[in-house]
Amino acid sequence: MDRRIAKLALEYAQKNIGVVEEGENAGEAVEAYLASCVPSLPAGNPWCVAHVRYRLKQAATALGLTYDKSMPRTGYTPDYVSWAVKNGHWVSSKKVAADKDLVRPGDLCCFYFSVMGRHAHMGIFEKWIDETHFYTIEGNTSPPQDIVGVERDGDGLYRKKRTLANLGENGGFIKLDF
């Protein structure tokens, strides 16, 4: 994927921070995100990945570039992680702990939930704040002041302050510069 797509997708996400649901996993913006998936997902479905997919597709179109045809188009985080591992685009949080330069603005962050036994939430990496904290833009999450932890079924699109530990034991990043 052309790096410009990842960077513009991040810019679009930043401009839409604060978009909230109208109902549960519904509303005009949320339904547009869900419709961007293949197959299209109806209102009521989790939309964190759908938001990422929507922004990448939107950015590719705006730049007149092709969205990588091998990349998943679903709304399911494990599909993206499997694809990234298979194609050499996966970077574990353990590797990133040793080298912060492995992840760049616009890359995708994938959260692993041990209680579910899978990756179950995705956002867009924004930037490092310091040695241990970074910002993400995440859909279908709780507001930043909610410090309960990682919320994968919240009400909006927010900037979140995270640590690598927040990604879970098998969490990591999908590099989008290929």
What residue ranges belong to the model's regions?
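N-terminal capping segments
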Residues: 1-69
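Active-site signature of cysteine proteases
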Residues: 128-178
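...with weaker cross-activation on analogous glycine-rich loops/strands in unrelated enzymes
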Residues: 10, 62-144
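Residue-level marker of intrinsically disordered, low-complexity segments enriched
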Residues: 3, 15-18, 28, 36, ...
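Solvent-exposed, flexible loop/coil residues
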Residues: 34-38, 84-87, 154
